[in-house]
Swiss-Prot record:
Residues 90-105, 350-362 have a biased composition (Acidic residues). Binds Apaf-1, BCL-2 and BAD (Bcl-xl). One of its GO terms (biological process) is apoptotic process. It is found in: Endomembrane system. InterPro entries: Aven. Keywords: Apoptosis, Membrane, Methylation, Phosphoprotein. GO terms for cellular component: cytosol; endomembrane system; membrane. The gene is AVEN. Residues 8-17, 50-60 have a biased composition (Basic residues). Residues 1-111, 214-237, 253-362 are annotated as: Disordered. This is Cell death regulator Aven. The modification Phosphoserine is found at S94. Residues 37-47, 61-72 have a biased composition (Gly residues).
Amino acid sequence: MQAERGARGGRGRRPGRGRPGGDRHSERPGAAAAVARGGGGGGGGDGGGRRGRGRGRGFRGARGGRGGGGAPRGSRREPGGWGAGASAPVEDDSDAETYGEENDEQGNYSKRKIVSNWDRYQDIEKEVNNESGESQRGTDFSVLLSSAGDSFSQFRFAEEKEWDSEASCPKQNSAFYVDSELLVRALQELPLCLRLNVAAELVQGTVPLEVPQVKPKRTDDGKGLGMQLKGPLGPGGRGPIFELKSVAAGCPVLLGKDNPSPGPSRDSQKPTSPLQSAGDHLEEELDLLLNLDAPIKEGDNILPDQTSQDLKSKEDGEVVQEEEVCAKPSVTEEKNMEPEQPSTSKNVTEEELEDWLDSMIS
C-alpha cells in the first residue's frame, strides 16, 4: 500500500498543486526541448519529465537534454535519470515509518500519578511531639527556637558535648558557688562598726544637725618679734651685737611680762609655754639674722660709746612702754638692772653668741 501511495503521490499530487495543467502540459514542453537539443537526450528528458515532481520535472528534462548531445552520453545518463526517479518513493517510505512510530507512541503513553511524600514528614513530627510533649506549632516562637536548637549546637566538637554531660550542678559544688545578691543583703544587715572594722564608740548613730565651727588660732607674738627686728638700726645700716642679742634673749619680756629684764646669761633664759608655741617663728627670725649684711665678727670694731648710747636709748623706750602696762615693782627692777647692763655688754664674746645660736638651732 505504501508503494502504491507513493506512486500516486509522485504523479498526481504535486503537479495538481503546483500547476493546473497536469501531466499533459508538463510533458509537451519537456519533449519539445528534448527534440530541439538532441534526439538521444529526448528520451532521457522525457523519462525525467515523467518521473519528476512539480517544477523539478522540467529541470530534470532539461538536464537530460543537455546530456543527450551524443548517443553514448545519453546511454550513460539514462540510468541516472531512472535512479533519480526511483529515489522519491524511498523518501516517502521513511516519512511514513516515522509518522507511524509517533502514532504508536502516542497510543501507548499513559500519565504517571504523582505520589506525595508528605506522610514521612508527618511521621517525624509525630515522633518529636511524643518525645517533647504536645505543642502547637506557631503558638509560641520560643517553642520553635527550642526545637531548632542553639547556634552552637551544630558546631560543637564531641569533646565539648562530653564536657556538657560531665558538668555538675551548682548544688554539688556548693563550696565554689557564691550568690552575690544574698551576700550583699547579708552585709547590709550588719552594723556599720563591723563593716568598717571600727570601735562602736567611734561611730555615731545619728548625724548632728549643726556642725561646730573650728576657728584657727592666730599667733600675734611672732609678729612682735619681726617688728622688733625691723626697728631702728645703728649707723651704716648695721645694728650692734647686743641689740640682736637682746631681741632674741628678750622673748620672755615680750611674751610673758612677769620677767621684764633681758638678761644675757643662760640661767635667766627659762622655757615657757609661749616660747614653745612660737618655735616656728624663731626659726624664721634666725633666718633673718643670718641674712643680715653685718657679720658677727664686726662686733669687736664697734665703739663702746656707741653701744652704750644705743642701749640707753633702747632701754628708755622699753621703760616707757612697760610703765603703761606693767606694775610699779617691775619698773623698780629695771632701775636696779640698768647699771649691770653696760658691764654685761662689755663681757659679750663670740663664744657666747655661738652658744646661743647653737641653742636656738637645737
